[in-house]
Amino acid sequence: MAQETLVDTSIQGKIVQCIGAVVDVEFARNQMPKIYDALKMEGSSLTLEVQQQLGDGIVRTIALGTSDGLRRGNIVYNTGANITVPVGKATLGRIMDVLGAPIDERGPVDQTLTAPIHRKAPAYDELSPSQELLETGIKVIDLVCPFAKGGKVGLFGGAGVGKTVNMMELINNIAKAHSGLSVFAGVGERTREGNDFYHEMADSGVVNLDKLEDSKVAMVYGQMNEPPGNRLRVALTGLTIAESFRDEGRDVLFFVDNIYRYTLAGTEVSALLGRMPSAVGYQPTLAEEMGRLQERITSTKVGSITSIQAVYVPADDLTDPSPATTFAHLDSTVVLSRDIASLGIYPAVDPLDSTSRQLSPAVVGEDHYNTARAVQGTLQRYKELRDIIAILGMDELAPEDKLAVARARKIQRFLSQPFHVAEVFTGSPGKYVSLAETIRGFKMIVAGECDHLPEQAFYMVGTIDEAFEKAKKM
């Protein structure tokens, strides 16, 4: 197991109450554990984490594992330290749980280097903002919401609009070409997706099964079937591994799927601890918990962490407290829309709702900026005219509006793109489109150089040249 540290058995307490994942433990008054101390069960690998001090020597803890079989009177030892997990090269190519224990049946993880999962965010004077762009090869993202190297990106979307597929495509396009290291934290998502991800990484060589230390990714999973304590802490475990690589001076990619489940686990734990719920039933400490995690996901003068986080949007409501709290911490937001998905346009990114702090002439250049704004302006005009078209039809529009609608429909279709990870479903090979090609294509459509082509020619192609080729065959 990951936590084979020597435990001081002199500081011991006993369980006085057990309600689901919440366990109350009584110690001598002068030996009360501190908040976030890890406690070990006698004769068991179960770890408890202290959440509250109730007084009279009693602490309230969360079980990081199943609490089946616990009884009042069971002996518990205080380790006197936070939960520590293995970090560094030993984690590469491995799948670990919240405590850093291996779950890939490939032997124990080397414990030479370990780090506590709770630590302070870097000081303000250590931070290093980045102006460098990270090309993703996905047209709509590179054009309207470009990513910064060392920035934070959120993929927002309701159920079934393609968050995980987009995340996998980004991993495919960035992590495989990226010379640095990646850390993937599966927080409360489906085990099947974690399994698929591992096999895909192994097939592409990012995980080197013959020589694990040559792998480029470390994986930490706390999936849907885990107790709330595991799901709440697994993001911190993944982040701790990413921070250790960053502090070695590396550029790290940190993928989290899904931040909403982290919030949800916090809600469950908060209710179990007996705290009064806040807006929409969320924990009163929602903003603080989110801030504590997000403030640590940052780039310093030593190395960078570029994080891409999937964020589930409950009932497609972006004003829900959970996604709304996440928004404030991000540099780029990619909003996936059910309306666009229903048109069959994938990736279903809403170009009018998605934003990026990088989209300014000073960062991306005048050409990119003007093209992106022209594309958004054309789509916005089409959106405004939709009601008129629905009532009166296209014939009643002014000639310039007819032209704007025709171009907007072409832009809309050109924003679609076949993905490498979706080849199995679509049957068409995935396309990686460079930023220069993306700008050239949209510039031509906006300038009217493609007005003679049918709009179907723009659907599910890579570059603008492919659209011309497709039009010839129609």
Curated annotation (Swiss-Prot):
Annotated protein name in UniProt: ATP synthase subunit beta 1
Organism (species): Polaromonas naphthalenivorans (strain CJ2)
Gene Ontology CC terms: plasma membrane; proton-transporting ATP synthase complex
Stored SUPFAM superfamilies: C-terminal domain of alpha and beta subunits of F1 ATP synthase (SSF47917), N-terminal domain of alpha and beta subunits of F1 ATP synthase (SSF50615), P-loop containing nucleoside triphosphate hydrolases (SSF52540)
The reaction(s) this protein catalyses: ATP + H2O + 4 H(+)(in) = ADP + phosphate + 5 H(+)(out)
Subcellular location per the Swiss-Prot or TrEMBL entry: Cell inner membrane
Membrane topology classification: Peripheral membrane protein
CDD domains: ATP-synt_F1_beta_C, ATP-synt_F1_beta_N, F1-ATPase_beta_CD
PROSITE patterns named in the record: ATPASE_ALPHA_BETA
EC nos: 7.1.2.2
First-listed, main subcellular location of the protein, grouped into a coarse class: membrane
Entry keyword Transport: yes
GO MF term list: ATP binding; ATP hydrolysis activity; proton-transporting ATP synthase activity, rotational mechanism
NCBIfam families, sorted: atpD
Chain ranges passing through the membrane: none
Domain of life where this protein originates: Bacteria
Enzyme class name: translocase
